[in-house]
């Protein structure tokens, strides 16, 4: 009885992070007795306030694979500079042969992005963005390229300090 109460209390608490399952892959290994099935999961987590991370997990059970991936993602969080509901400037993210072009969009445009890029943008908290995936369509590499692009964003404050200008001169 005590354990069930603890579980209910834990489930009723508001979650700190939004978890998005991007890819679940069932793989099988042939052994002497037949085929052994295992699962691989790719998960993106974010707080919708500018922090995001991704993780991969492998296990013999789907739920364990997702749990492992979520824990790994929470350990690999990065902070992204978000201006209002979009990104401050255009950026290109690369990982291996996957390239992702991210462009800021005016308010009300929405997230114009494909599967993996959309999940990352939702987890970060970006509401308006335009994107184009170029090169490889591999899901894992696309997620890594998207995060590379988001990591390379300049903050308005840092840009104004580097150029020796005020914030109003740069962003208008």
Regions found by a protein language model. Give the residues of each.
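Ribosome-associated RNA-binding proteins
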Residues: 1-172
């Amino acid at each position: 009885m005590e354990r069930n109460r603890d579980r209910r209390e834990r489930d009723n608490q508001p979650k700190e992070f939004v978890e998005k399952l991007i890819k679940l892959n069932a793989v099988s290994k042939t052994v002497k007795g037949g085929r052994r099935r295992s699962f691989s999961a790719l998960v993106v987590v974010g707080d919708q306030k500018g922090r995001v991370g991704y993780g991969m997990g492998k296990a013999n059970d789907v739920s364990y694979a997702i749990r492992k991936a979520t824990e790994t993602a929470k350990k690999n969080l990065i902070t992204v500079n978000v201006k209002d509901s979009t990104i401050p400037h255009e950026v290109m993210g690369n990982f291996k042969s996957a390239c992702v072009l991210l462009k800021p969009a005016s308010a009300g445009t929405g997230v114009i992005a494909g599967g993996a890029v959309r999940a990352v943008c939702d987890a970060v908290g970006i509401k308006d963005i335009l994107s184009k995936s170029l090169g490889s369509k591999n899901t894992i590499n696309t997620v890594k390229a998207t995060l590379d692009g988001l990591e390379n964003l300049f903050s308005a404050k840092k840009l104004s300090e580097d150029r020796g200008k005020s914030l109003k001169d740069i962003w208008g």
